[in-house]
Amino acid sequence: MALVEIFKAILLGIVEGITEWLPISSTGHMILVDEFIKLNMSAAFMEMFFVVIQLGAILAVVLLYWKKLNPFTFDRGVSVKQETIEMWFKIIVSCIPAGVIGLLWDDVFNALFYNYQTVAVMLIIFGILFIVIENYNKGKRPRVNHLSQITYTTAFMIGIFQLIAAIFPGTSRSGATIVGGLLLGVSRTVAAEFTFFLAIPVMFGASALKLLKFGFNFTGPELMILLIGMVVAFIVSVISIKFLMGYIKKNDFKIFGWYRIILGVIVLLYFSARTIIG
């Protein structure tokens, strides 16, 4: 396998690790990156790769938040942390909309909406939403300042926003759920953390489905490319998550909104020009 393919896998892992957690759409960036950095692999492998590489990103969440995610303590025998168990139930409730609809209609939605026009439009729409919501919430105190204060109703409503991201590429799963949280009165840090945790079952489920569809029939180079991408995505995700949590403790999400709008315009102009030129 050529070194250039390894370098491409590293670049794709970096893009995944950054864009999966910042609310700027990993799909939007992957579409652009794939336009210029194409791995010399089959179309079936690349479809699977762009989803399963997320396992590296999700393992970063598990590592960084293990104490909050683990419902068991072993100080004096095994005991259960009721608050953590309840949080997991809320995560499950939040996953229901995207989980059910995604399983039934995933291929249909991909066929209808997986194109640069949808990606560009959703980048811009949710970019505007971030700016509008942050301006609206300016000076207001959030109602939810701890994960335990998220109700089952709020969790389900955040799940509806995740469903929007599942249907329309370019929305950004993290962007949609954070927007949903902010609209529902959840603080920035809690909305971000809940988004991270919500990704665990979603990404594991999506990766499992893609692996089953691919059939685990890896060649040696394919397996190496996938592992390299996942490891790099894991390392970069750790850095990205720490950066985001530090940033939003002192700042709002408007900078990400402006970035999304600019990127959406770039995607729209670039692919429109390419289509016209042929």
UniProtKB/Swiss-Prot annotation:
What is a single molecular function from GO for this protein? undecaprenyl-diphosphatase activity
Q: Name one Pfam family in it.
A: BacA
Q: What does this protein do?
A: Catalyzes the dephosphorylation of undecaprenyl diphosphate (UPP). Confers resistance to bacitracin.
Please state the Enzyme Commission number of this protein. 3.6.1.27
Top-level division of the source organism's lineage: Bacteria
What sort of enzyme, by top EC class, is this? hydrolase
One Gene Ontology term from the biological process aspect of the record: regulation of cell shape
Q: Where is it mostly found? A: membrane
Q: Which UniProt keywords apply?
A: Antibiotic resistance, Cell membrane, Cell shape, Cell wall biogenesis/degradation, Hydrolase, Membrane, Peptidoglycan synthesis, Transmembrane, Transmembrane helix
Q: Does the keyword Transmembrane apply?
A: yes
Give the misc comment. Answer: Bacitracin is thought to be involved in the inhibition of peptidoglycan synthesis by sequestering undecaprenyl diphosphate, thereby reducing the pool of lipid carrier available.
Q: Which organism is it from?
A: Desulfitobacterium hafniense (strain DSM 10664 / DCB-2)
UniProt-recorded name of the protein: Undecaprenyl-diphosphatase
What cellular component GO annotations does this protein have? plasma membrane
Where does the UniProt annotation locate this protein?
Cell membrane
Q: What is the membrane topology listed in the Swiss-Prot or TrEMBL record?
A: Multi-pass membrane protein
